[in-house]
Amino acid sequence: MASPPAHRSSKAADEELPKASSTFHPSLWGSFFLTYQPPTAPQRANMEERAEVLRERVRKVLKGSTTDQLPETVNLILTLQRLGLGYYYENEIDKLLHQIYSNSDYNEKDLNLVSQRFYLLRKNGYDVPSDVFLSFKTEEGGFACAAADTRSLLSLYNAAHLRKHGEEVLDEAISSTRLRLQDLLGRLLPESPFAKEVSSSLRTPLFRRVGILEARNYIPIYEKEATRNEAVLELAKLNFNLQQLDFCEELKHCSAWWNEMIAKSKLTFVRDRIVEEYFWMNGACYDPPYSLSRIILTKITGLITIIDDMFDTHGTTEDCMKFAEAFGRWDESAIHLLPEYMKDFYILMLETFQSFEDALGPEKSYRVLYLKQAMERLVELYSKEIKWRDDDYVPTMSEHLQVSAETIATIALTCSAYAGMGDMSITKETFEWALSFPQFNYKNFWFICTALQRCRIDQA
């Protein structure tokens, strides 16, 4: 939650319009996505047909790859994943990864190959020991890498960021290579593809990047590589454009839902950030099968934004407590508990959750029940923070961490993502695990988010 609201109690005369006000700037997007017009059906069909031809052509290349040509095979898999194409070849890639992991017969003196192999395997869940880099250490504490071998230096830097606690060799690799890359960047042509790669890695290491953005940024870099595969390049461009069409359709739907929500509920004080929220959620699940997850995530984030603004900047304490009481009932009959300005929103919220059940169908609609439980927990903790404020209570560090780790809505967003996934491996046990608030998962996530936010504030 943000700063404390201005009022702690409600009066009958002010029931319909609380005194607190907001200062949020309006949306930068206006009706841009509402007026989006997709290509015609024949145009879309032609794009899909060409993409399928290219997918099979690339599949043949992938199936022809072996560990006998390890550098080429590792580079191909890395390229496909960076270009956002890995989803289409999961089975082929998994088979090759197992072979790469099992095959210890490769040039262990090739720093670029060792780094790329390490990065690829660790990124895909294989427990590769970091001592493969020990042989490259120098007596001075750096890493043996020829001045001209800049590619190996960059590969080592990205690989080292997949470190685990206590892996000193990777800690040292990051410190050493960062300094050398920073020095190197000043001597490269700013517009060269490699300079852009170095700059991007120094800003955000490869494995931390949002996949769909990485695909967009890497396409023009890959296009200039002498060893590029033309089928891979064409497919990457076409696939990205097809995904953009889907994203625009989803944003059009979410924008229409949001505009209707705000117009009917008359909650003009809330932040209008539906486009930014979709962009945020898209980063979590951008692959083609997860359209419903993206939509549910975006709508839930929109609802959380409204509730957060009610509790933080607009509603009185009494109003918020009434809302919290009505929230857990999930029934229209509870609107008599609410102040007038909350009633329409409450009904529209119920309709939104019903639309989730309708979209999921009879076999998966049970997932919405768990999503409701996650939202109930979130509102309960928002109320707890308000009580702390009104009572001038200073929580202990332990109490603060426990509550704030949940009020960033990780549980609600996790359940939202799971709810929209068609994969039948998502079961009731999956949701029960998420709702159990696994400490290693959410608390670490909260700590990382908070630390990164503090770093950005310090840098500003």
Swiss-Prot record:
Compartments where located: Cytoplasm
InterPro entries for this protein: Isoprenoid_synthase_dom_sf, Terpene_cyclase_plant_C1, Terpene_synth_N, Terpene_synth_N_sf, Terpene_synthase-like, Terpene_synthase_metal-bd, Terpenoid_cyclase/PrenylTrfase
S-S bridge residues: none
Superkingdom of source: Eukaryota
Residues that, per the record, bind Mg(2+) 1: 308, 312
One GO cellular component term: cytoplasm
Keyword entries, A-Z: Cytoplasm, Magnesium, Manganese, Metal-binding
Residues that coordinate or bind Mg(2+) 2: 308, 312
Key word Cytoplasm present: yes
Cofactor(s) annotated in UniProt: Mg(2+); Mn(2+)
Pfam families: Terpene_synth, Terpene_synth_C
Main location: cytoplasm
Transmembrane residue ranges: none
A biological-process GO annotation: diterpenoid biosynthetic process
Cofactor note: Binds 3 Mg(2+) or Mn(2+) ions per subunit.
Entry keyword annotation includes Cytoplasm: yes
GO molecular function: magnesium ion binding; terpene synthase activity
Pathway as given in its UniProt record: Secondary metabolite biosynthesis; terpenoid biosynthesis
Motif (DDXXD motif): 308-312
Subunit comment: Monomer.
Entry remark concerning the domains of this protein: The Asp-Asp-Xaa-Xaa-Asp/Glu (DDXXD/E) motif is important for the catalytic activity, presumably through binding to Mg(2+).
Protein task: Non-functional sesquiterpene synthase due to a frameshift removing part of the catalytic site.
Note: The allele found in cv. B73 encodes an active enzyme while the allele found in cv. Delprim contains a frame shift mutation.
Family the entry assigns: Belongs to the terpene synthase family.
Name listed for the protein in its UniProt record: Inactive 7-epi-sesquithujene synthase
Organism: Zea mays (Maize)
Gene coding for it: TPS4
